[in-house]
Amino acid sequence: MKKFLLLSLMSLSSLPTFAANSTGTIGIVNLRRCLEESALGKKESAEFEKMKNQFSNSMGKMEEELSSIYSKLQDDDYMEGLSETAAAELRKKFEDLSAEYNTAQGQYYQILNQSNLKRMQKIMEEVKKASETVRIQEGLSVLLNEDIVLSIDSSADKTDAVIKVLDDSFQNN
């Protein structure tokens, strides 16, 4: 009975020590900041915005042409001045251009979504590598995404260190 009591007492007394040690080995990383503030994240975001703008410009030209044809189709005086064949051709052109626009828009969104997914995967791979480097350098047991932590001391935030490793890695490549 004395051995059990002694063992229980030793176990209980070691719990606060273990808890104190384990909290010092946990760090957090704000992924959003890594994406927005790292050189890699900024570069990838700029390339994505450039692609979006290119698509928007090409879609804008089609929209202008569709709008112009639509205005003509809605103008009764203009349509009355056309022959039946010319009016039919104008309607057909509008239908074809509308179908082409809808197809292009669907492809545009699909390409943008795929590109964004690849971009995020690439950045996340680099954040994981940088996080592992920081975890080892700082002697941490674990680095967690800040979004899953309800409360932790601000000294556990290792986001700046991860961003620095990301930037160093980006400059070396």
UniProtKB/Swiss-Prot annotation:
Keyword Protein biosynthesis: no
Secretion signal span: 1-19
InterPro entries assigned: Chaperone_Skp, Skp_dom_sf
Molecular function terms from GO: unfolded protein binding
Keywords: Signal
Gene3D superfamilies on file: Skp domain
Biological-process GO terms, alphabetical: chaperone-mediated protein folding; protein stabilization
PANTHER family assigned: CHAPERONE PROTEIN SKP (PTHR35089:SF1)
Family to which this protein belongs: Belongs to the Skp family.
Protein name as it appears in the record: Skp-like protein
Organism: Chlamydia trachomatis serovar D (strain ATCC VR-885 / DSM 19411 / UW-3/Cx)
